[in-house]
Amino acid sequence: MTATPAQRRPALPATRPYPARHGPKGSYLRKMVTTTDPKDLGVLYLVSATGFFLIGGLLALLMRGELARPGLQFLSAEQYNQLFTMHGTIMLLFYATPVVFGFANAVLPLQIGAPDVAFPRLNAFSYWLYLFGATMATAGFLTPGGAADFGWTAYTPLSLSEHSPGVGADLWILGLAVSGLGTILGAVNMITTVVCLRAPGMTMFRMPIFTWNILITSILVLLAFPILTAALMALAYDRHLGGHIYDPANGGAILYQHLFWFFGHPEVYIIALPFFGIISEVIPVFSRKPIFGYTALVYATLAIAALSMAVWAHHMYATGAVLLPFFSMMTFLIAVPTGVKFFNWIGTMWKGQITFETPMLFAIGFIVTFLLGGLSGVILASPPLDWHVTDSYFVVAHFHYVLFGTIVFATFAGIYFWFPKLTGRFMDERLGRLHFWTTFLGFHLTFLVQHWLGNEGMPRRYADYLPSDGFTGLNTVSTIGSFLLGISMVTFVWNGFKSFRYGEVVTVDDPWGAGNSLEWATTCPPPRHNFYELPRIRSERPAFELHYPHMAERMRAEAHAGRRAGHGAGAELSVPSTVATKDDDHTS
């Protein structure tokens, strides 16, 4: 593998100190509140999700502060329960899921050459449902009894009215139902947009990998989220109308766990697959190569989605009420298509002319972290090993490596990657590198040691421990790492604010110089309906062909897929050069 140092582009003058204001003061706010433009809604999703991410991170810092030393107890046990309940809920359902739709709204219509999404007003309605539901659930902290305190899984009978009588629990249930409805409607919109609004020439196997992953994720949303909504409505019915749905005689706790995890495990892939797609967009651009194994990546994504519906009960090994061999085998099997993706990402970088701009740094951080999380997942997939570490900090470390490693690293890769496209300005590269290294080091310092804590027997969800337990040293290290992680977010927020106002102005359609998909064939930022003119779409790399038409024949000859000339997605590249270069003088 060869690597070349990142070449700093010549500084461009900031021709304006701040994006020009059109209309009277306050008109921008009014525009964002009433908008149906998917790019604006994407920004709203991303900003709102980042806000909830900061709230969830603050809750995590309070928990880590509590656990830094034994006997501190600046939080009561009840407050600690509320913190870990809302931390998990916010991070998974109010940050990770909506940030998927933020990227989907901002980028997917551009990538398929569509002027808008299929249902613009429904799209806006979906966002406001999410924001209203998330605010409702989080508002439990303002009630006299505090927020929900039964864990983000809300297992019965703990979540029934006898054990959790507060208003905060009801707000949590209804907030998740409302927010989940917004997610379902957003998925319907994305599926319809991909099926109905692709540009001429944009066949399914010419779509970018990110678009494929959003399509498959949206199908998973339609399969999983209605189950969560039904389970929550049944829980509300039990709490207030005496439904007895979760009584032991009718299935009880095991029935609820099956319903919840039939949603819960597909949810893990609902919030993972889109970020796999982001990484699949970032790596080729900064490796200066086409994606290795495009078709294999698509089929691997389909395989992961299918298998994700068949592994939910591996969360229930400890109950003894599930068929262990089947669910263990399915869990091991899901590692195969995931391994295919790793093979393709590494194959894309192999012998590439790699440059290490901030998006690429976060993409590599994603690969390293997610790989380590997957290795601990192999341990947990085996029931005999899982029984020894279940409900310990080993499990906490595993799912943070998998989820943080996937969602947060890929989120930042996507933001740094598409920020110039959406705003017309670059983010600060030095602050970006500082952000990456503080995030990477802070994360691994926080969660690597938690594997050892779990192996030594520290249970999760405990608000305190004894000095004689021997957990003090590793907990102190973990807390130091968590505060370093918190500092990294200050860097990111300042970078985003500073770059939006004063960042280096983008003057070209493709600021990274090697963009493949259609969003790099329009202006930065794009016009209201995305394109002034669409280039011809002959393969899965239309923007690259537009900007480098003289490379068409070589790209066909060196295609990884080894298609025969005249067949497959790259066949049109063999047309006479007079046709292939017809759009040479095209400008977007």
From Swiss-Prot:
Residues 1-26, 557-588 are annotated as: Disordered. It holds the Pfam family COX1. Binds 1 copper B ion per subunit. Binds 2 heme groups per subunit. It is a multi-pass membrane protein. It is an enzyme of class 7 (translocase). There is a cross-link at H265-Y269 (1'-histidyl-3'-tyrosine (His-Tyr)). It is found in: Cell membrane. Keywords: Cell membrane, Copper, Electron transport, Heme, Iron, Membrane, Metal-binding, Respiratory chain, Translocase, Transmembrane, Transmembrane helix, Transport. Its cofactor is Cu(2+); heme. Its EC number is 7.1.1.9. The keyword Cytoplasm does not apply. Cu cation binds at H265, Y269, H314, H315. Signal peptide: none annotated. Its main location: membrane. CDD domains: Ubiquinol_Oxidase_I. The chain crosses the membrane at residues 43-63, 90-110, 128-148, 171-191, 214-234, 259-279, 291-311, 320-340, 360-380, 399-419, 434-454, 477-497. Pathway: Energy metabolism; oxidative phosphorylation. It catalyses: 4 Fe(II)-[cytochrome c] + O2 + 8 H(+)(in) = 4 Fe(III)-[cytochrome c] + 2 H2O + 4 H(+)(out). GO terms for cellular component: plasma membrane. Fe(II)-heme a binds at H87, H400. Belongs to the heme-copper respiratory oxidase family. Cytochrome c oxidase is the component of the respiratory chain that catalyzes the reduction of oxygen to water. Subunits 1-3 form the functional core of the enzyme complex. CO I is the catalytic subunit of the enzyme. Electrons originating in cytochrome c are transferred via the copper A center of subunit 2 and heme A of subunit 1 to the bimetallic center formed by heme A3 and copper B. Associates with subunits II, III and IV to form cytochrome c oxidase. This is Probable cytochrome c oxidase subunit 1-beta. It comes from Nocardia farcinica (strain IFM 10152).
